[in-house]
């Protein structure tokens, strides 16, 4: 559930100057108002305000049995100078810009929820590089279970809106997320925030004609599911709704009567099924031990390949994504050990609305080095596609 302790409206029937004094908001007038949103900011130093907010969250867990909360606009809580110019904010007691009272409040909030509601999750929507969002409070962290990976979302969506010709010049947008992927426990979220306010729906963000939009979205979802981190896709994106989300009307379920939309839904269903069945996707999700690049720098063909695995696994799943409308034959990927590849998912499958370009049978590795690996394999990658292969290491070749 989206839960917002960062600010509240000035409406006279609400909490603003509740008893004629700044009861819920900051006592210092210039720090009480959010300069960008025109709302009021809670006084996190107040025990009464802390009790009110934490009780609010607990109420939803106890009475409505929610699974977790997503705390909105955490960045605006953490920085005293958020949205403010020099001279418009007051430093903390240590002379810095971090809102120490908000930090203490978030730590208390997470401790309270995770102790009293075992199995609950707390998620921070935080868009900066503030450290230790998902670290335990006793280690100096805020104590959240997960943090939304805003960087992955922005980079991949910006990339997918580019004409494929220009993607080679922006290859880093695909790969940069792995520079920080294990610094927090991330959720890769394509949320409601990205399909409102004239930002376009997920399918309409994709570059190209009608067929290419569907192929591109299948490729993007395939990359999202194989990338380290948990997954979140807002409703409607799984079957390619063309209009933006409107809270005042239902989704366009009638689109499932059209082959391309139903095929996309089937593809998303298969991604979920495969994700549940292949533990390499989540067993080692927060360490380089679970991920290895197999081909990362082929910017000319805008194609990447990587391995998901875990320590002790006899192989894993290889993911290859082609972000151009050009078929790549004899595409080379490195392999850490001799073994075989067998295609287990192909977004270009005719079942999912594709053209049906496959890798038939078993592909065997060659003792030909590639990048820093001693072995390699040659595969076919369809245009605008994501292909998963089951990789089995040949015995006695580890």
Where are the regions that the model predicts?
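Substrate-binding/active-site clefts of carbohydrate-active enzymes
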Residues: 1-97, 363, 379
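Residue-level preference for long, well-ordered alpha-helices that form the structural scaffold
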Residues: 46-49, 53, 94-102, 209, ...
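Alpha-helical packing segments of well-folded alpha/beta enzyme cores
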Residues: 49-60, 105, 109, 220, ...
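Conserved alpha/beta catalytic core and glycan-binding cleft of carbohydrate-active enzymes
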Residues: 65-67, 85-250, 276-348, 355-356
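Extended carbohydrate-recognition surfaces in non-catalytic/accessory domains of CAZymes
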Residues: 256, 351-367
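Catalytic cores of secreted or luminal carbohydrate-active enzymes
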Residues: 259-281
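C-terminal beta-strand-rich structural cap/linker in extracellular carbohydrate-active enzymes
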Residues: 360-398
């Amino acid at each position: 559930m989206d839960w917002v302790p960062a600010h509240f409206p000035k409406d006279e029937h609400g909490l603003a100057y509740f008893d004629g004094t700044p009861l819920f908001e900051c006592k210092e007038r210039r720090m009480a108002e959010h300069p960008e949103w025109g709302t009021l900011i809670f006084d996190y130093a107040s025990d009464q305000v802390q009790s009110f907010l934490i009780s609010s969250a607990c109420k939803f867990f106890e009475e409505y049995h929610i699974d977790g909360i997503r705390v909105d606009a955490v960045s605006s809580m953490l920085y005293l100078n958020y949205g403010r110019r020099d001279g418009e904010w007051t430093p903390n007691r240590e002379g810095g810009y971090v809102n120490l009272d908000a930090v203490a409040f978030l730590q208390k909030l997470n401790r309270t929820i995770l102790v009293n509601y075992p199995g609950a999750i707390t998620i921070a929507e935080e868009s900066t590089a503030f450290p230790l969002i998902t670290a335990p409070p006793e280690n100096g962290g805020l104590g959240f279970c997960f943090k939304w990976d805003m960087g992955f979302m922005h980079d991949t969506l910006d990339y997918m809106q580019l004409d494929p010709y220009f993607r080679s010049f922006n290859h880093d947008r695909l790969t940069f997320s792995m520079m920080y992927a294990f610094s927090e426990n991330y959720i890769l979220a394509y949320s409601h925030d990205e399909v409102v306010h004239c930002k376009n729906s997920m399918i309409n963000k994709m570059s190209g004609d009608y067929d290419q939009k569907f192929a591109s979205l299948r490729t993007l979802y395939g990359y999202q599911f194989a990338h380290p981190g948990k997954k979140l896709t807002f409703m409607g994106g799984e079957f390619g709704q063309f209009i933006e989300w409107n809270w005042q009307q239902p989704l366009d379920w009638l689109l499932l009567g059209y082959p391309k939309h139903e095929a996309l839904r089937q593809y998303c269903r298969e991604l979920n099924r495969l994700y549940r069945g292949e533990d390499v996707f989540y067993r080692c999700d927060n360490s380089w031990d679970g991920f290895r690049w197999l081909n990362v720098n082929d910017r000319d063909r805008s194609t990447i390949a990587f391995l998901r695995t875990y320590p002790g696994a006899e192989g894993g799943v290889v993911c290859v994504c082609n972000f151009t409308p050009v078929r790549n034959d004899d595409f080379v990927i490195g392999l850490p050990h001799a073994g075989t590849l067998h295609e287990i998912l192909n977004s270009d499958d005719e079942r999912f609305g594709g053209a049906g370009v496959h890798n038939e049978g078993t592909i065997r590795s060659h003792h030909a080095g590639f990048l820093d690996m001693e072995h390699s394999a040659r595969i076919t990658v369809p245009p605008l596609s994501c292909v998963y292969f089951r990789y089995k290491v040949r015995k006695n070749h580890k």
